[in-house]
Regions:
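C-terminal motif of bacterial Sec signal peptides marking the signal peptidase cleavage site
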Residues: 30-32
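Short, surface-exposed "cap/lid" segments of acyl-processing enzymes
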Residues: 95-100, 108-146
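Bacterial N-terminal signal peptides that target proteins for export
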Residues: 10-22
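Primarily recognizes the serine-hydrolase "nucleophile elbow" in alpha/beta-hydrolase
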Residues: 187-258
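Conserved alpha/beta-hydrolase
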Residues: 137, 143-164
């Protein structure tokens, strides 16, 4: 029975995600520019290295989407084989220091004048799910290859904390680093295209993201629109976003007795901010035992799957958070947390 429930849940999630992907693809074809306005010279020197990984065949994508995911309509978007490349590029860490990050680039084979698309990935717990790692044949990279097969060159940033930076904690829902890692991935991608003499069409880049990727997409859009950029955002599509972190945090703490869709996400968020902003209180002031010990022992170090992480956390927020933390927050006594959250609000 348990396996059947999990299978149904996965099918429902695949259906929901495919419907969002299908709508996004239709918008891409409808709204994308068609004029060829390639950049003559890269403005930023960010690309460090590139490596060809593999080619994803149309038949493999059709097997995944039509057979495994049960989405026969996906076949109409699968028009090209897709070459997958891993790249390493320069970006900034949480302290503004230079650091090498990684990502994947998906190039449709023999596609005439493909458009540009950057996909910011959703919340992940395992480094194996990072785009450049591409650990399994049915990986997230394989799933996103449908966008490239439809006729787009796709940039997939890992974010900090994954790929070549997997030895460091991921700054979860952190505006500055999500925006910079995604933006610098695009800059490195443009250099990659020029170095490999790959032509593309348009003077803008479409941006999409789901869950944490939706937050990253809006942060990236803001960065591109307010700072120097050789490209401007074209279509911007976001699914299941949380932009107003302060209001979301208020709601969560005021409704800790209500069912939570992703307890692990809230634990990840609080642990990440505790690390980024060096909160003065120990984790045990926020999380009940034994969850505080599990988090301190590396629950979010990228070595475990989402199911493994979830199995080590409670099902309710009241079990996760200490009563003293909840009371402090309600009394307006969590200045460090509230300040950090407000700094990352996007609305």
């Amino acid at each position: 029975m348990g396996n059947q429930v999990v299978h149904r849940e996965r099918q429902m999630e695949s259906m929901k995600y495919f419907k969002w992907q299908a709508l996004t693809l239709l918008l891409l074809f409808t709204l994308s520019c068609s004029d060829n306005n390639n950049i003559d010279e890269p403005v930023f020197e960010t690309l460090v290295s590139e490596d060809f990984n593999r080619t994803i065949l149309q038949s493999s994508m059709e097997f995944f989407w039509v057979t495994l995911a049960g989405q026969p309509d996906a076949a109409s978007y699968i028009n090209h084989d897709v070459d997958v490349y891993r790249i390493i590029y320069q970006t900034k860490d949480i302290n503004g220091n230079s650091i090498e990050a990684s990502g994947a680039i998906l190039v449709p084979v023999n596609a005439p004048q493909p458009g540009l698309l950057s996909i910011q990935h959703a919340t992940i717990f395992s480094n194996n799910e990072a785009p450049s790692v591409d650990a399994t044949q049915n990986s997230a990279t394989t799933r996103k290859a449908i966008f490239a097969s439809a006729g787009n060159i796709v940039f997939l940033p890992d974010y900090l904390g994954y790929g070549v930076t997997s030895d460091q904690p991921h700054p979860y829902q952190h505006k500055e680093t999500l925006a910079s890692a995604s933006f610098d991935m695009i800059m490195a991608g443009l250099e990659f295209l020029e170095a490999n003499e790959i032509e593309w069409s348009g003077s803008s880049i479409d941006l999409i993201g789901y869950s944490e990727g939706a937050y990253a997409t809006l942060a990236l859009t803001e960065k591109m629109e307010t700072g120097p950029s050789p490209l401007q955002p074209g279509l911007v599509s976001m699914g299941a976003p949380i932009f107003d972190l302060s209001s979301t945090m208020d709601y969560v703490i005021n409704n800790v007795d209500q069912p939570a869709e992703c307890v692990a996400c809230y634990a990840y968020f609080l642990e990440s901010y505790h690390t980024i902003y060096s909160f003065s209180r120990p984790l045990s002031d926020y999380f009940n035992s034994p969850y505080d010990e599990r988090i301190m022992d590396g629950l979010f170090d990228g070595s475990q799957s989402s199911a493994q992480v979830a199995s080590q956390l409670p099902e309710s927020m009241t079990e996760l958070f200490t009563d003293s933390f909840i009371q402090r927050y309600l009394n307006g006594e969590e200045d460090e947390l509230e300040s950090a959250v407000a700094e990352n609000d996007l609305l």
